[in-house]
Amino acid sequence: MDEFHRCGKEDSFWQQCFLYPLFFQEDLYAISHDHYLDVSSSSRPMEHLSSNDQLSFLTVKRLIGQIRQQNHSIVLFVNCDPNPLADRKKSFYSESVLEALTLVLEVPFSIWSKYSVEGMNESKSFRSIHSIFPFLEDKFPHSNSILDARIPYSIHPEILVRTFRRWIRDAPSLHPLRSVLYEYRNSPDNLQRSIIVVPRVNTRFFLFLWNYYVCECESILFSRLKRSSHSRSLSHGSFPQRTHFHRKIKHIIIFSRRNSLKSIWSLKDPKIHYVRYGERPIIAIKGAHLLVKKCRYYLLIFRQFYFHLWSEPYRVCSHQLSKNCSSSPGYFLRVRMNPILVRTKMLDELFIADLITDEIDPIVPIVPIIGLLATEKFCDISGRPISKLSWTSLTDDDILDRFDQIWRNLFHYYSGSFDRDGLYRIKYILSLSCAKTLACKHKSTIRVVRKELGPELFKKSFSKEREFYSLRFSSKAAARSQRERIWHSDIPQINPLANSWQKIQDLKIENLFDQ
């Protein structure tokens, strides 16, 4: 990999590298064999594992020949036999070949992505999903409209192969990829007869396809937006759900009402800002309504002519930030005016001026979260706590741990909102639901449970916010916590409740356009 990278920097050798001979390297299949055993051992029971899972390189070469000959007796994606032990040897070799194919294709892709980032010094990828909010804090208040787009999932296999040819000139190395893609497209489980590229599929091959597909879309889109806009540069950042990360925030970022914010992205005359979390890109635009309509039209045409995809209208929707709330990952987002009183003393006279600035105001969706808690049987539809009957068979420690995990995730994820009063209502619902669950388990009352357990009942589950401030900040900083928003660098994914609410919001948008 280092040799490929060195050659790629010097003479763009990575565009012309011959990858097909790598398919016949025994070391490559030894790596894929070990990786497959590691993954399968974590998902299969111990009685299904065997010490005879040895890799035969001759069998691998026969399977490669079958792929080249379009022999569909090899099945890489479907196991039609319900017996997990039947035909396991065949599945073992198929997975090894698929793993090796992914490893070979990852070589030029990783070089290309690193080379483009180091050469352009523009793309920024962060591990924590909270990294999206400092970007919004810094860029979105200066915009007046946003385009909420979604990356299409379904794509034809030949389009993927054609885009691979842009940076892989070794045509024989693409024949196995084409065969594998068409085999998946024609498999009985694939009812849509297309390649569904999603970031949530937990396989190395589909994660690679997703990373490649997103990078291909963004690299072309950025260059087109730069040419079409009058700004000298385009600010953009890509966030979680990717397997390759070039930069990482290592510390917690605190934004205060009173302190001026230091710019993270230093740009000259920016007018278009692009941010993506998962499969949802957001483009913020500062300009007239006609410019917003042109950008929306351009995105639809771009997908239609470059990827041969017909995008539904709801997949690219526009609205003004000053009038509407946008649903970002788990938050309601709006831009509000923040008046600041400034006193300037010159000699004996005192001048008072009012400055009005715009700032992003993340709002916790309390009512939808309570509705989701009611769906999960923690409370009724009005928010009244009830016992979690399905957990009464667990031990007391397990019950406390589960409520503790729910509250800790909610509190950490929504710590970036100034108004956290609604979170304490959710805390009340969870704490009383925990007490009722324990009371139902022991066939007693809440008063008896509190008397028996005493302060230990909620000491473990519902004091995490105090521990958080005491461990990470001084007492003075903890006193200012009500006027500060805190973004964390250790949140790799959206909170499950927030993710469920986000899906409901997306369905509402789809139904609105269907009517």
Curated annotation (Swiss-Prot):
Signal peptide: none annotated. It is found in: Plastid, Chloroplast. Pfam families: Intron_maturas2, MatK_N. GO terms for biological process: mRNA processing; RNA splicing; tRNA processing. Keywords: Chloroplast, mRNA processing, Plastid, RNA-binding, tRNA processing. GO terms for cellular component: chloroplast. Disulfide bonds: none annotated. Its main location: plastid. Belongs to the intron maturase 2 family. MatK subfamily. Usually encoded in the trnK tRNA gene intron. Probably assists in splicing its own and other chloroplast group II introns. This is Maturase K.
